[in-house]
């Protein structure tokens, strides 16, 4: 027995619901630039299920942080002048879709706002071989996927033993990926939409953008919206007014030492009086729920401003590290009740 993968848009129509998302070819990411319904659907299905070798999931989807955006808006209007050149950064923004949704609203509130969406990985690397095979790698050279229609093999997950043919294909793919890793890690691209293609006969090496077409469209439409690479463990070169970091400072991805390092990076990246929007989306609940804390930077740490659905689970840790002011229960701090 073998499990067929989704290798084309026609496969998406016929096999959807049969092949799990991990068996959707990352090659289809390239078709998103066509900006038609089927290609964007394929892009969103891949992104929603994409897990990198670090364990970080790219999971995101349209409207995911809509209630967070609605909550934050009035606080920003009450803290900053409408004509101020507000600098907003959205860290670990995945494909940038929810960033673009938030940015469009902020541009109406703050016409001079500069918005930067960032993520550590903005593209994957595709190696197309002359025999119809494709290997998908992270920019560092770590293999993610092997595609040889009708097979789509994920290197992060193993198929059930009953799919014997898939397991044989995986063994072959692991050998091929190992021989290509060093070559892939040698090449660099200037941006996520860099069209440069390297030829190492019989192979062609190019990138697959991980940026959603709607975010890319906004990036082309206005200089006020940027998409850049950035690590959530590193401070910015220049401090800004607002940083949002949703669904990244999580113990599934980082130990306490790195989470503390990330919190310090946020603190050092904010202007005095700047805001940090911290939280996660609890997908286990149906419907999903955002648990968020809004904090303001002071001279000595962060001051609590508002909580949504009980606030971030990291509040206690931040307090133990001395990053939340002891006088946090101020009159303007309020909690949005849980459902």
Regions found by a protein language model. Give the residues of each.
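Class I S-adenosyl-L-methionine-dependent methyltransferase module
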Residues: 8-40, 104-222, 320-327, 332-339
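A short glycine-rich, Lys/Arg-flanked "PGG" loop and its adjoining helix->strand segment in the class I
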Residues: 258-272
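A short beta-strand submotif of the Rossmann-like class I SAM-dependent methyltransferase core
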Residues: 244-250
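S-adenosyl-L-methionine
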Residues: 2-81
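A short acidic, Gly/Pro-enriched loop at the edge of an enzyme's catalytic core
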Residues: 233-244
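Conserved beta-strand signature within the Rossmann-like core of class I S-adenosyl-L-methionine
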Residues: 272-281
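Conserved class I S-adenosyl-L-methionine
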Residues: 83-98, 116
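Conserved SAM-dependent methyltransferase scaffold
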Residues: 99-103
């Amino acid at each position: 027995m073998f499990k067929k993968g989704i290798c084309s848009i026609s496969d998406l129509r016929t096999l959807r619901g049969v092949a799990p998302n991990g068996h959707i070819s990352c090659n289809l990411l390239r078709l998103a630039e066509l900006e038609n319904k089927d290609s964007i659907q394929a892009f969103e299905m891949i992104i929603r299920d994409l897990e990198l070798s670090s364990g970080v999931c790219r999971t995101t989807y349209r409207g995911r942080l809509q209630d967070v955006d609605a909550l934050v808006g009035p606080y920003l209007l009450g803290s900053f002048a409408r004509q101020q050149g507000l600098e907003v950064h959205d860290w670990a923004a995945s494909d940038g879709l929810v960033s673009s949704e938030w940015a469009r609203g902020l541009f109406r509130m703050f016409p001079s706002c500069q918005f930067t969406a960032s993520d550590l990985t903005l593209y994957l690397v595709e190696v197309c071989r002359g025999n119809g095979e494709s290997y998908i790698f992270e920019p560092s050279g770590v293999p993610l996927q092997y595609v040889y229609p009708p097979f789509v093999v994920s290197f992060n997950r193993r198929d059930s033993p009953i799919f014997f043919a898939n397991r044989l294909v995986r063994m072959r793919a692991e050998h091929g990926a190992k021989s290509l890793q060093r070559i892939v890690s040698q090449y660099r691209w200037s941006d996520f939409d860099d069209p440069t293609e390297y030829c190492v006969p019989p192979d062609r090496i190019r990138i697959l953008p991980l940026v959603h077409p709607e975010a890319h469209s906004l990036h082309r439409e206005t200089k006020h919206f940027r998409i850049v690479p950035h690590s959530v463990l590193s401070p910015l070169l220049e401090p800004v007014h607002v940083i949002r970091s949703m669904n990244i400072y999580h113990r599934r991805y980082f130990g306490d030492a790195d989470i503390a390092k990330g919190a310090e990076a946020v603190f050092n990246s904010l202007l005095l009086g700047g805001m940090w929007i911290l939280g996660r989306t609890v997908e286990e609940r149906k419907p999903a729920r955002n648990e968020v804390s809004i904090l303001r930077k002071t001279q000595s740490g962060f001051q609590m401003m508002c909580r949504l659905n009980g606030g971030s689970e990291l509040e206690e840790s931040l307090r133990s590290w001395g990053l939340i002011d002891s006088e946090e229960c101020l009159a303007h701090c309020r909690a949005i009740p849980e459902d």
